[in-house]
């Protein structure tokens, strides 16, 4: 059974043509992308690394890592965002191998073939996030790193990520997030350890509505990122 929610795939598919517009519904992704890429690059030095981007969508992270010199494969199950990602390569001349395949299926085909795996802003959109993490762990080489990000589940995250972002500030379309699918860091760490991944770093990502800027820091109460290493 495919670990995907068709309604979620359809939702992002309908918005796909605006993926690379920094003033569209994807503005938050454009705003956080440099922070995410810098964080990953500092941990593994992307140049020359073979990296898999799981849930790549329209390719913002995938292409950004390719610009830093990584050999990137991007996978997604939504046809339209993948089409947009491929078209954008024609504009920029970057090289990314985009494929429509589930992470679980790719793990059967290419176990242990990547220096690093990224799965950012995706886990809260699938029915079984632990299955995704297990597949990510299988795909990375022993000693390689898996980078994860999602939304914490607590009253503050509901207030900020759902009410604030979708209804008050209208930064995201209404219905972008389902609070019931938000994931506590302790849950993410447990799933990582079950998959033979050791959590090494936990970083929060905060938004300042006055400056309209994002920053990384210690506050993991809403958005957060986790860096893990696969045991040798």
From Swiss-Prot:
Reactions catalysed, semicolon-separated, are: a 3-demethylubiquinol + S-adenosyl-L-methionine = a ubiquinol + S-adenosyl-L-homocysteine + H(+); a 3-(all-trans-polyprenyl)benzene-1,2-diol + S-adenosyl-L-methionine = a 2-methoxy-6-(all-trans-polyprenyl)phenol + S-adenosyl-L-homocysteine + H(+)
Entry EC no(s): 2.1.1.222, 2.1.1.64
Which residues are involved in binding S-adenosyl-L-methionine? 36, 55, 76, 120
- Annotated keywords: Methyltransferase, S-adenosyl-L-methionine, Transferase, Ubiquinone biosynthesis
Look at the named UniProt entry and state the broad enzyme category this protein falls under.
transferase
Keyword Repeat, does the record have it? no
HAMAP family cross-referenced by the UniProt entry: UbiG
Please give the function described in this protein's UniProt entry. Answer: O-methyltransferase that catalyzes the 2 O-methylation steps in the ubiquinone biosynthetic pathway.
Protein name as annotated? Ubiquinone biosynthesis O-methyltransferase
Organism name: Dechloromonas aromatica (strain RCB)
